[in-house]
């Protein structure tokens, strides 16, 4: 690697840690430095990291001093080739809040947009009409107001920053939110009342690309780490469903309804070599010219046909899946049904799976070892396991995690 892709600049060590760990959970190789970027980047081990979190220790500093420190750190990270910046701030607005945000934005680039949302709903921090709440109270009515070093005197973040504020809008897409943010630049506070709002904002930041400087706590960092990981994924997640279990069929239907492009051969096509060759040629030719999708599904038909057993169905679909992966690329593979999972691995000549996590109980996530697609993310699932949305979640787990091959 040539150096970190993502830089995190935090005003204290604990905040740096609780933000950096969100990137670890999303699969990024992450290094936390107790000091600044210059010292960290001199370490060969740090140069191998994908995410570097640096600590400015600037929370108790005067505004001008804090701004100077932050500006220097961002400039050094930028010079080192960092492509994405996350400015970690205190979730109760302590410190030289405005000075550090302005310094980070200006150092990042002329067209940079600071997107500010310190919400962390799981810890009770939310932003409503621009006001930061801790539980049901504005932050100035909490102990943060009497902090002995950096007391908080303003709950309304747009007043504190002198900037625009955007309320959440029901049904708004991330792209629509991104357009509103861009129109309100260069500094924008965005409301977030719950995790869904924070996740939508993270996706909007992904749409904005490199010019966005997200400003927040661990609450925004968690979904953003997944969004940025998804930006590294190439191709669709290929889902292979061979199980006849009713749960698997319902899960496949849910995935198709969510937008997965689906190829489903008939029993007659699977049973006859000539029919099968013609159908697979049609699929492979069509996939060359079709628009990109997040998920592509190969779905075995329901029912039985004399002379056609489950192993043959699994083998044919597994071999087709392997050809699609090798010809077109894929972000990963999800296989439901033990025979189907075995067939996919056999067709790719994989020797095993290096496990890294699980999508949900009994649904492991890993990467293939050996064979023609070593390092390819893979989820395997028994046909009867999981809730109705488990295939959707499995595809998301692959797309929203960083895998280092």
UniProtKB/Swiss-Prot annotation:
ATP binds at residues 243, 337-340, 383. Gene3D superfamilies: Four-carbon acid sugar kinase, nucleotide binding domain, Putative sugar-binding, N-terminal domain. GO terms for molecular function: ATP binding; kinase activity. Its EC number is 2.7.1.219. It catalyses: D-threonate + ATP = 4-O-phospho-D-threonate + ADP + H(+). InterPro entries: 4-carb_acid_sugar_kinase_N, 4-carb_acid_sugar_kinase_N_sf, NBD_C, NBD_C_sf. Keywords: ATP-binding, Carbohydrate metabolism, Kinase, Nucleotide-binding, Transferase. The keyword Ribosomal protein does not apply. Substrate binds at residues 12, 59, 88-91. Belongs to the four-carbon acid sugar kinase family. Catalyzes the ATP-dependent phosphorylation of D-threonate to D-threonate 4-phosphate. Can also phosphorylate 4-hydroxy-L-threonine, with lower efficiency. This is D-threonate kinase.
